[in-house]
């Protein structure tokens, strides 16, 4: 009895949504073109970081080789982007990674993904709103901050902000009102601001190549000494590297690439438009790939121009572009850069706010969050309640809280979503070409089929069928789960025991070699299984290699987070599990459908019994 109850409970946690190939019906308005999705992706990804990040990384980590950092970071990010693109072509819904997890690995993982996406978008919105407020305040001489500091102070360091940011509050509420007007209106504003941002960045890149000097990529120690002697008469070269194009060596490039990786986060907002894109199976993959390519060109071009205009060690880490234009004698250009920065912050803010209610709506429609969040406006066809609720929460966060310590928490949610999407692509590529059934139906079907199919060594490495079967699909499912565990263990070892590995400690080197051997062997089993041949507008190439590399990169970056960040993540997940086990698991649409099916079955049984009784009595 207890075993059956536990079995039913476990089945609830892994029950999956039906995989619907095609667009299907939606209550939202299909009004977004491919251009709208590209603008949304570029605007969300190409935020204020392009105006700040290049200076910080070039000065302290990579020097002129920052261009290679952005190339490495782009290649790492594009792995996750390709996985999102395939799912956008295969499962065009509004839930992004939440929906992809639900149709592949089950309800509990889907809730975990969606819950963390909500946190990421809320923190992202609030932090960008405060950055917008700070940038505007800086333009007008810091009058806003000085006035508020002199009248209202919040004396709770590391929890509340130094002062309440009324400007950030008003900005988030204003953009919430814009989102309420409909997806087409917000898409138009995004296109305008993204276009202005790209024009400013084009001016920066062209100006940099005109005014730049190639000698700034070939600096020597003599140049460093000359600079130091002009400043204070000393020659401390430790912080400047060893000269040349790669002054900090390969290690500097890798450290810089890890920082630059976060510059490409944001494209996943395109995946939340599956129910509003006119042709999602084509537009979502194209939008993701094109937007990532544009962002790479922008980052690559700006970092090249910046390091050509002035020596990297003279860059100002907080405002590199204005300082670079002052260095080459183009002082008025700093105002154009300021306008571009505000446009970038505006599109980044919209890019964080747009997907937030879509994820809430998708989860509420499935019953995992409160159903009221799934209410859609009859005129604008947007999730009205989810939009208002998410906007108010983000505005409140921007108004009161110090968000510096929460940015890493936002990164965990994003990286977890990227990892799960990569795993889901790996699993779904090898599943039979059929709609996913409920857990109970699938288990019955599998038991019948597996009686005919037996797991042998030949089935692992030389399967007979050229198309996926239930057995080959289950093999890939188990192997993918094992690979996820092994990759996590590998990342833990590489993070916590770096020193003994570098020194060649035979114990830890053996451990790493064994883990890599197991990963290669299990990957070989997956590689030998037949793939699903359903035609899609886009498919990830080199499966299973690329999804596995994507998982490794994302998990490794997650392991770099501090213990405090993981503690906050644990608290957030406890709140989420309280909602899921207290509400979602009972109100899930899968649960409701099961309860609706049972009475019908019982009614048919009663009718049959009554009919039989009547026959006997006659």
Curated annotation (Swiss-Prot):
| TM regions (residue ranges) | 37-57, 62-82, 108-128, 163-183, 192-212, 245-265, 286-306, 336-356, 381-401, 407-427, 475-495, 507-527, 540-560, 569-589
Give residues where Phosphothreonine occurs: 605
PTM note says: N-glycosylated.
Q: Which residues carry this modification: Phosphoserine?
A: 617
Q: Which residues are glycosylated?
A: 232
| One Pfam entry name | AA_permease_2
Q: What tissues is it present in?
A: Expressed in adult brain and in a wide variety of embryonic tissues.
Task: List the ranges whose topology is Extracellular.
Answer: 58-61, 129-162, 213-244, 307-335, 402-406, 496-506, 561-568
Taxonomically, the superkingdom here is Eukaryota
The GO molecular function terms of this record are: basic amino acid transmembrane transporter activity; L-arginine transmembrane transporter activity; L-lysine transmembrane transporter activity; L-ornithine transmembrane transporter activity
Which UniProt key words apply to this protein?
Answer: Amino-acid transport, Cell membrane, Glycoprotein, Membrane, Phosphoprotein, Transmembrane, Transmembrane helix, Transport
- UniProt feature coiled coil, ranges: none
What Gene3D superfamilies has UniProt attached to this entry? Amino acid/polyamine transporter I
Q: Which reaction does it catalyse?
A: L-arginine(in) = L-arginine(out); L-lysine(in) = L-lysine(out); L-ornithine(in) = L-ornithine(out)
Q: Which InterPro entries match?
A: AA/rel_permease1 (IPR002293), Cat_AA_permease (IPR004755), CAT_C (IPR029485)
Q: Name one GO cellular component term.
A: plasma membrane
Q: How does it sit in the membrane?
A: Multi-pass membrane protein
User: What GO terms describe the biological role, i.e. biological process, of this protein?
Assistant: L-arginine import across plasma membrane; L-arginine transmembrane transport; L-lysine import across plasma membrane; L-lysine transmembrane transport; L-ornithine import across plasma membrane
Location comes to: Cell membrane
Q: Which residues lie on this side of the membrane: Cytoplasmic?
A: 1-36, 83-107, 184-191, 266-285, 357-380, 428-474, 528-539, 590-618
Write out the similarity annotation.
Belongs to the amino acid-polyamine-organocation (APC) superfamily. Cationic amino acid transporter (CAT) (TC 2.A.3.3) family.
- State its role: Uniporter that mediates the uptake of cationic L-amino acids such as L-arginine, L-lysine and L-ornithine. The transport is sodium ions- and pH-independent, moderately trans-stimulated and is mediated by passive diffusion.
- NCBIfam families xrefs: 2A0303
Name of this chain's protein:
Cationic amino acid transporter 3
Give the source species: Mus musculus
Encoding gene, per UniProt annotation: Slc7a3
């Amino acid at each position: 009895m207890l075993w059956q109850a536990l079995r039913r409970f476990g089945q609830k946690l892994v029950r999956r949504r039906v995989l619907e190939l095609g667009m299907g019906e939606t209550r939202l308005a299909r009004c977004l073109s491919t251009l709208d999705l590209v603008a949304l992706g570029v605007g969300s990804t190409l935020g204020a970081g392009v105006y700040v990040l290049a200076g910080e990384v070039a000065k302290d980590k990579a020097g002129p080789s920052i261009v290679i950092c952005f190339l490495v970071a782009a290649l790492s990010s594009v792995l996750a982007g390709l996985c999102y693109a395939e799912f956008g072509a295969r499962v065009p819904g509004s839930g992004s990674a939440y929906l992809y997890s639900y149709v592949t690995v089950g309800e509990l993982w889907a809730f975990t993904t969606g819950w963390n996406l909500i946190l990421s978008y809320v923190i992202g919105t609030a932090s960008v709103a405060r950055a917008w407020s700070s940038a505007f305040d800086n333009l007008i001489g810091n009058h806003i901050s000085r006035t508020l500091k002199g009248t209202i102070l919040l004396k709770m360091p590391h929890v509340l902000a130094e002062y309440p940011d009324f400007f950030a509050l008003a900005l988030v509420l204003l953009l919430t009102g814009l989102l309420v007007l409909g997806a087409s209106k917000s898409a138009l504003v995004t296109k305008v601001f993204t276009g202005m941002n790209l024009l400013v960045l084009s001016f920066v890149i062209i100006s940099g190549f005109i005014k730049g000097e190639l000698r700034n990529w070939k600096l020597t120690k003599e140049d460093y000494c000359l600079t130091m002697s002009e400043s204070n008469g000393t020659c401390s070269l430790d912080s400047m590297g060893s000269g040349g194009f790669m002054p900090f060596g390969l290690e500097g490039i890798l450290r810089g690439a890890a920082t630059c990786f976060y510059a490409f986060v944001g494209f996943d907002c395109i995946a939340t438009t599956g129910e509003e894109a006119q042709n999602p199976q084509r537009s979502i993959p194209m939008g993701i790939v094109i937007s990532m390519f544009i962002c790479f060109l922008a980052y690559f071009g700006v970092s090249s121009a910046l390091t050509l205009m002035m020596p990297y060690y003279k860059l100002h880490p907080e405002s590199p572009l204005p300082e670079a234009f002052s260095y080459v004698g183009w002082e008025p250009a700093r105002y154009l850069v300021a306008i571009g920065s505000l446009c970038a912050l505006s599109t980044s803010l919209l890019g964080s706010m747009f997907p937030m209610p879509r994820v809430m709506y998708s989860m509420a429609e499935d019953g995992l969050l409160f159903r009221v969040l799934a209410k859609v406006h009859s005129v604008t066809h947007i999730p009205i309640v989810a939009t208002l609720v998410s906007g108010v929460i983000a505005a409140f966060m921007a108004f009161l809280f110090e968000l510096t310590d929460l940015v890493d928490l936002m990164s965990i949610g994003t990286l977890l979503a990227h990892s799960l999407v990569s795993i889901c692509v790996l699993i779904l590529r090898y599943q039979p070409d059929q709609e996913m059934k409920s857990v109970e139906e699938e288990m019955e079907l599998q038991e019948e089929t597996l009686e005919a199919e037996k797991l042998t060594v030949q089935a692992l490495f030389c399967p007979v069928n050229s198309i996926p079967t239930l057995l080959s699909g289950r093999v890939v499912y188990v192997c993918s789960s094992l690979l996820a565990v092994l990759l996590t263990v590998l990342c833990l070892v590489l993070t916590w025991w770096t020193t003994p590995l570098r020194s060649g400690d035979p114990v830890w080197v053996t451990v790493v070699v064994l883990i890599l051997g197991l990963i290669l062997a299990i990957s070989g089993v997956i590689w030998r299984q037949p793939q699903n041949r359903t035609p899609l507008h886009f498919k990830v190439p080199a499966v299973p290699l690329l999804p596995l590399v994507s998982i490794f990169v994302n998990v490794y970056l997650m392991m770099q987070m501090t213990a405090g960040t993981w503690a906050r993540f644990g608290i957030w997940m406890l709140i989420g599990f309280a909602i899921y086990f207290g509400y979602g698991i009972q109100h899930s649409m899968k649960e409701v459908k099961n309860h609706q099916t049972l009475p019908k079955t019982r009614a048919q049984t009663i009718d049959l019994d009554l009919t039989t009784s009547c026959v006997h009595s006659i």
